[in-house]
Amino acid sequence: VKYQNLSSIKRGVVKIGGASGNNLEYLVKELSERVKRGEEWLLVHGGSSYMDNLSRALNMTPKYVVSPSGFRSRFINSTDLELFRAACSVFSIQLVSSFGQRGVNAVPLYPPDNISAVAKRKDVLRVTENGKVRLIRGNCSGFITSFRNDSIFALWDLGALPVLPPLAYDEKGYGVLNVDGDRMAAAAAASLKAEVLIILSNIPGLLQDPNDTSTLIKMSTLEDWTELEGYSRGNMKRKLQ
């Protein structure tokens, strides 16, 4: 994929989802070319399909919840978190290998050894089940409160490609938390003063009708925000925000 209008970019953040169906070949090829010509890029990745595969192998059923505002997310308890960290490592290793084959040094940054995102734990979640709102406890996910970019700049100085999983350090020092990958990418882009944030997914994009790909909204501006928000559903709400 060639981004004709991004030919002059010097610094950017790209996020690739962890869901099945993503083709990494073109991303790795173009990002490798850009890094080799001196551009500074950060790659943020998800881990959902890898988590699903590990869960099935261990006969564990993933638990998904929906917030009252319509956001769908995976519920992560302490056991799930260890499994999710392993799943992210599998994806990171795959990416490191793919970029290495093209002569690019991709370096994963994992907390607590390398802290980029810092988050506040959301121990209690409000979820909607059967039309009712209830509270569930034991959640090991969080929302990002700050972002440290020293390690990323250090890797850029070495001509490397930093790779970030959707994991953050607990602001109270209690270990690692799962965070939303899209919001991780957005926080990183803001902290690094990136010229562009690109979020790649296995779906076409924002659709006026989720069942009709011909209704894809190819381009818009902030002036159309209210209209765009009306079209967003499920996880697309988070990507827009």
For every predicted segment, state its role:
Residues 1-241:
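Nucleotide/pyrophosphate-binding catalytic subdomain
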